């Protein structure tokens, strides 16, 4: 099994104690979905719209915080979205979590690097869009 970006993301999620992910497969993020079966510790919940993924990850982290013991690790909500409209559909959930300091990780795809800034199909500056409502952008 060759380590690639998708496997590195999934392995990192497992190592950080993530067990549940909310998302909707789509074009640019398919490499991540292709390797998910290799990580049985990650339970993916399929949503009908990316906005649901953002809100469900937010709610999941809030609910986990309400029932966790003080010594337990803080549970983070994780959601996936594909490039362009898939990523922008996550924004309301990200903002909602940010407003209440709920730990949420949103992983989105993008167009290939050489196509950024060319108005490529499903290109959106998700970093620029979320700069005010996020702590870190990679």
Predicted features along the sequence, with ranges:
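N-terminal alpha/beta PP-like core and its mobile active-site loop of ThDP/TPP-dependent enzymes
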Residues: 1-137
């Amino acid at each position: 099994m060759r380590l690639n970006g998708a496997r590195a993301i999934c392995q990192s999620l497992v190592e950080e104690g993530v067990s549940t992910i909310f998302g909707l497969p789509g074009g640019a993020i398919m490499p991540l979905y292709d390797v998910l079966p290799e990580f049985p510790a990650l339970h993916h919940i399929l949503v009908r719209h990316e906005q649901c993924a953002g809100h469900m990850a937010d709610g999941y982290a809030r609910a986990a915080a309400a029932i966790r013991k003080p010594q337990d690790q803080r549970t983070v909500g994780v959601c996936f979205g594909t490039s362009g409209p898939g990523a922008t559909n996550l924004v309301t959930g990200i903002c909602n979590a940010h407003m209440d300091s709920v730990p949420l990780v949103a992983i989105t795809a993008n167009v290939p690097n050489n196509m950024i800034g060319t108005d490529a199909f499903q290109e959106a500056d998700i970093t620029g869009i979320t700069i005010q409502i996020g702590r870190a952008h990679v």
